[in-house]
Amino acid sequence: MKPHLKQWRQGMLCGVFAWGLFFVVIFLYFTDSSPAKPAPSSFSFLETRRLLPAQGRQRAIMGASEGLPEGADLRRGSPRGLPSGPLRTWAGDGFEREQEFLSVQTGRTSLSSFAPEDSAPGTSGRLFPGDPGPEGARPPRAAPGRRAKRGPRRQSLSARGEDGERLYSSMSRALLRRLWKGDASARMLHPRLQKAMGAYLRANKHGVRFRGRRASGRSRTELLCALRGRVQVRTLDGTEPPFSALGWRALVPPVPLSRLLPRRLRTCAVVTSAGAILNSSLGEEIDSHDAVLRFNSAPTRGYEKDVGNKTTVRIINSQILTNPSYHFMDSALYKDVILVAWDPAPYSANLNLWYKKPDYNLFTPYVQHRQRNPNQPFYILHPKFIWQLWDIIQENTKEKIQPNPPSSGFIGILLMMNLCGEVHVYEYVPSVRQTDLCHYHEPYHDAACTLGAYHPLLYEKLLVQRLNVGTHGDLHRKGKVVLPGLQAVRCPPGA
């Protein structure tokens, strides 16, 4: 009996050992084949995705070289002397014969009335509580045993999301009214935008060191006189290193931008790309101005009723020149108009440092375009002009503003205030059609496009509204701000 019992015990032990080994192997197999993936940071994915549009959405475009530009030495193959062709009279005579050039620009049916083949528009992340987030941002599913407990919780979250949407909508309307009055604050922004602004303030990518004095209580006249005395349009003229050593003096247009348009320009229009301009029926009014400025890749074809068709000046950021999807070299959007490009540079405006490491390498395509189209006026704004505008915004704002360059919109407004007797700006300060649609020609939504995260947009708009001499009705219904040209401002001696 004992031998049988002993054999039985040994068999039991072997069986237990075999089952244990089997379970260990199974456990190791499943844990090795499906390792736990670390959960992505909620800020790194969601906030980055949400905040990219704050820089115009295009700041997310990759592929542009930021290294030392190649092929920018113009000592060989650069166009020498004055250009030939139909604009020779403009280049040679300068201010005397600009009307010949202007007649081509301001009275034309824009060849740029259609959009280039653009990349697919981005998709927006979740903007408000209750909005569906992007794919991949969904919370992990609950375990089966906990599903019954999550029902009431989900209902409460849904109700809370709807309450959040209503609250934000209410805040947005309140902020719009305060913006119309010119006394809004960053504290009224959505928490997401406040968080973004704080991040940019801490980062200070461009090394901003503001040493000016703040004078936020200036009257409209004092502010206009300060602008007149300090804001002088400046572009690269090829006389400063490193551009002087590269032959840029023979490359840039011989007539400065400030003297290009005749002083008979009575009124000019600055047409923003804001989605709020849709269904405005402002096209005919916009085309009635002597000159019209537009931005980046904003088309007119298909939108003529709302945005008009005339284009005189187009301001483009450096991404337009560097990203192939914009077809900068061959698109009709950028032909037969005055082009003005810009790129963020260090606050010190060190041209050597900027040339070696631009935000996007606009120098090479600029050289190529000038060599191919020597008769088309094409300028690059000087970094000192860009940061001078930033200084003025900060000087006239109580709060600290983002240490990033002003938006293309603000740059364009101040540019036209230097060139025109009166400037009408459309949908820069939003009308009652306010929307989170970033651009009228792209299905992309983000509040940062209107109120700013990267650019100090909120403070720019508050400053512009302080300068507004137009009517409240035009502001509310049309989103139109009327600004006096700086040359028309009458200032006391010494102002």
UniProtKB/Swiss-Prot annotation:
Glycans are attached at residues 279, 309. One of its GO terms (biological process) is carbohydrate metabolic process. Signal peptide: none annotated. Residues 63-90, 107-165 are annotated as: Disordered. GO terms for molecular function: beta-galactoside alpha-2,6-sialyltransferase activity. This is Beta-galactoside alpha-2,6-sialyltransferase 2. Its EC number is 2.4.3.1. It is a single-pass type II membrane protein. InterPro entries: Glyco_hydro/deAcase_b/a-brl, Glyco_trans_29, GT29-like_sf. The chain crosses the membrane at residues 11-31. It is found in: Golgi apparatus, Golgi stack membrane. Residues 32-495 are lumenal. It comes from Bos taurus (Bovine). Its main location: Golgi. Residues 144-153 have a biased composition (Basic residues). The keyword Transferase applies. Belongs to the glycosyltransferase 29 family.
